[in-house]
Amino acid sequence: MTEKQWKKNDETEILIEDMGKDGEGIGHADGYTLFVKGALPGERVRVRLMKVKKRMGFARLMEVITPSSQRVTPVCPVAGPCGGCTLQHLSYEAQLEVKENTVRNCLQRIGGVDLEKVEWLPIQGMNGENESPWHYRNKAQFPVRMGKDGKAEAGFFASGSHRLIPVESCQIQHPVINEVLAVVMDFLREKGIEGYDEEHHSGLVRHIFIRRGYFTGQVMVCLVLMKETLPEEAVLLERLKKVEGFTSLYISVNSRRTNVILGEDVRLRFGKAYIEDEIGGVRYQISPKSFYQVNPVQTQKLYARALDFAGLQGHETVWDLYCGIGTISLFLAKAVPQGKVVGVEIVPEAVENARENAKLNGFENVSFRCGAAEDVAPGLLEKYGADVVVVDPPRKGCDGSLLETMVSMAPEKIVYVSCDPATLARDVKRLGEMGYELKRCQVTDMFPQGGHCETVCEMEREDK
């Protein structure tokens, strides 16, 4: 029998069998794999093929013929086209189940892990007392473009494109962030200030970047401009001062053709150079370029679990690789008052922030080094030793050379904090081949309504 040759705009009916890592439904048409945004497992749907590759295709959801019992009506009116939330159409309980299953499947399929031998702790969701899977984010980056009415509009890009989906507020951002967005956009439209035109590389305002300290309520606003001057800036400043918690106004000049949001030139125009926030009794200073987790409520749970998995008694030497501004490092330093924490980070500004944060909290048992961990660690190992290594890499996971370095340090435990189940599974397999066994694991839902999650794994040296 000849295999059907699918082409763009073909329509077909399929059963959704599974869900991908980004929340897309997965089904098959005559053996051909199709990814369908907005479709849920168990649903029979009609789809139209939009992109056809040799082994798989991407299709648009045209009709849900048989809906899932877990399908819900999205709260946000642009949940479908917007690239921000991929799971608003799925009940929150089902979102948690999908995320946990995704991690388990990756560890089994890619990592070759026998889950019967792993202690699996239930996923940490935002469904506890006084918690909500809405309005949890402490950071927003709104691109600004020109609308059809000739005035500036802000929003988010449609998935996989730079087509702006205009929004007036976002259901996963803190209400104060939405208030700031409204203040800035009312000002831009009132004064006739242009948004960025990506095609012609013209206009003035490229992005509105807002951060808020969840536990302090402090608010930072950064406007990313093509030029250094914002017309009638003083008027906007007076309006922003009426927002509860408003602390800082920055202007970032970015005149390059680039997808990078902030320019090299970031200037403080009003207030403090940073805002502060707190996680588990540790305070942090956050500047426009600082990496800081977007969901502090879940971050506190995540770090508490990492600390639990580390099993610290108070005297150990702990290494924190990819330490950023020291968020996990300072958590660890608090737990080893008679011990030592060494944080390693390749971004110089983050290392400077980490040192300032240690000083802010009065920690003298933590130090930070700038460089690649595989270069920094060997030279300091004889001086400090290593009882526990904590690693929190980006989505790409750890380079092979870093894994080898970690193993050569011979810690009793490795605590791996991951934001990507596939690369986590790959690295768990590599570490297993080098003598470290996966003992305990827990998923934390850092991004309700979205497809991503964080996982903490405890790995123990087999010959200890």
Question: Predicted regions span which residues?
Answer:
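Short beta-strand micro-motifs enriched in acidic
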Residues: 39, 48-52, 143-147, 211-215, ...
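Internal alpha/beta scaffold segment
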Residues: 164-206, 227-253
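Short, aliphatic-rich beta-strand segments
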Residues: 210, 217-226, 283-287
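Hydrophobic beta-strand signal
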Residues: 46-48, 141, 319
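Extended interfacial segments that mediate partner engagement and assembly in macromolecular machines
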Residues: 62-74, 80-195, 215
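Rossmann-like S-adenosyl-L-methionine
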Residues: 2-15, 21, 228-464
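Short, acidic/hydrophobic/Gly-rich beta-strand patch recurrent on exposed beta strands
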Residues: 25-30, 155-158, 222-224, 354
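Terminal RNA-binding accessory module
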Residues: 1-78, 108, 367, 374-375
